[in-house]
Amino acid sequence: MFTLGTALSNQIDANWQTYVMIIVYFIILLIIGFYGYRQATGNLSEFMLGGRSIGPYITALSAGASDMSGWMIMGLPGSVYSTGLSAIWITIGLTLGAYINYFVVAPRLRVFTEIAGDAITLPDFFKNRLDDKKNIIKIISGLIIVVFFTLYTHSGFVSGGKLFESAFGLNYHAGLLIVAIIVIFYTFFGGYLAVSITDFFQGVIMLIAMVMVPIVALLKLNGWDTFHDIAQMKPTNLDLFRGTTVLGIVSLFSWGLGYFGQPHIIVRFMSIKSHKLLPKARRLGISWMAVGLLGAIGVGLTGISFISERHIKSEDPETLFIVMSQILFHPLVGGFLLAAILAAIMSTISSQLLVTSSSLTEDFYKLIRGSDKASSHQKEFVLIGRLSVLLVAIVAITIAWHPNDTILNLVGNAWAGFGAAFSPLVLYSLYWKDLTRAGAISGMVAGAVVVIVWISWIKPLATINAFFGMYEIIPGFIISVLITYIVSKLTKKPDDYVIENLNKVKHIVKE
């Protein structure tokens, strides 16, 4: 009998072809990293944003791959397997959020970040948009990014280490270091261009995997009658409303609000060649996301019948994809599918490393170094950017060396933290002419604080009243919106040229 959640190497003989496939995958990543390094010009914007020269298809898949992470391949199938189709509500919320993001945020952000000081980070954009000469908003938002993304990144290293431990019986720390060395190499040397190309490559692998596994599982089981079998085994798992409430569904939908403020996702919009290419990126990106999420749901559902038929003991449902990929397929294909999991994990790690590095370099080092003759110090800034990648990675690896549940729980709420702190501010910055520095700073801080307070002290009260169990992005987002508006109305309006920039952006986007 197989057991979900224990080392597969103890249950399935690892074939040399599986290892070959993983090694080939790593070699391809290293080659892409070297290519990115060869293309480098020594310019910070080029290292951090690819010189704003990225095409629509790489933009689309790199955004999707860095967004979905291992959650799409491991988390969602495990959730569907355990709780059923009620997990679909979060996928609807995420897809709607991503779709709206392409329409509402992407075009204006791409144009605005270039015409207003050529901002290469989100904090830099806030600073330029609000004419914050004291750099207060830049420092606060940069600090939020550095702290939360360092913690966020460590969870990816933990996932990578556990994958090698589970699939190959390798020591956790050895697996962690293997993932770290590869991802640091291509991010350190290749910068944004290498990260974007590898994310595109990894996005393709992830999509193929999410289509292959549920289809082959259906063919190996009982075809479409498998769903009838599932209904017999776990009838409640096909119920969209099982175990949910109106508040629960709203909470799941609200995940979509976070998209407008996720730095590692919206930076993709800043790097595309032209805002006119965004419709192409949107069509591919949302299609990729929809197919991938449907595939993940398919893995979870077919897994119910598969696990039962094969008499596999379930301890950790999130290893469902790993088990199915290794039992259903030839070792060579199984290795490819394990590479898909690594792709999901590493694409997010690299994106978060680069965003954090960008913030350390652009939002802190350049402030300390001074802006005088900045153009003559580009190679120095690129070097600092590379060293920042290494520094953040070392800190994240150190935290991941001894996984701590408390930290992992905090990382699980980082989406809400970024969404509450940055989403309202991004929307206000792009659409509201009366936004002021004081309003922006107050709303951003209030959103982040509400999320932390809700997680720490209010959410535990859900045992008394279900209302307190709502997803923390909802109160955080609402408070941030209100505080930003009220404080902006009570403080001095921005200068005319700030409003002129906003009008200029509107005009360019409409062209």
Curated annotation (Swiss-Prot):
It catalyses: L-proline(in) + Na(+)(in) = L-proline(out) + Na(+)(out). One of its GO terms (biological process) is proline transport. It comes from the Bacteria. Keywords: Amino-acid transport, Cell membrane, Ion transport, Membrane, Sodium, Sodium transport, Symport, Transmembrane, Transmembrane helix, Transport. It is found in: Cell membrane. Pfam families: SSF. It is a multi-pass membrane protein. InterPro entries: Na/Glc_symporter_sf, Na/Pro_symporter, Na/solute_symporter, Sodium:Solute_Symporter. The keyword Cell membrane applies. GO terms for molecular function: L-proline transmembrane transporter activity; proline:sodium symporter activity; sodium ion binding. The keyword Transmembrane helix applies. Coiled coil: none annotated. CDD domains: SLC5sbd_PutP. One of its GO terms (cellular component) is plasma membrane. The chain crosses the membrane at residues 16-36, 54-74, 85-105, 139-159, 175-195, 199-219, 246-266, 284-304, 327-347, 381-401, 407-427, 438-458, 467-487. Belongs to the sodium:solute symporter (SSF) (TC 2.A.21) family. Catalyzes the sodium-dependent uptake of extracellular L-proline. This is Sodium/proline symporter. It comes from Staphylococcus epidermidis (strain ATCC 12228 / FDA PCI 1200). The gene is putP.
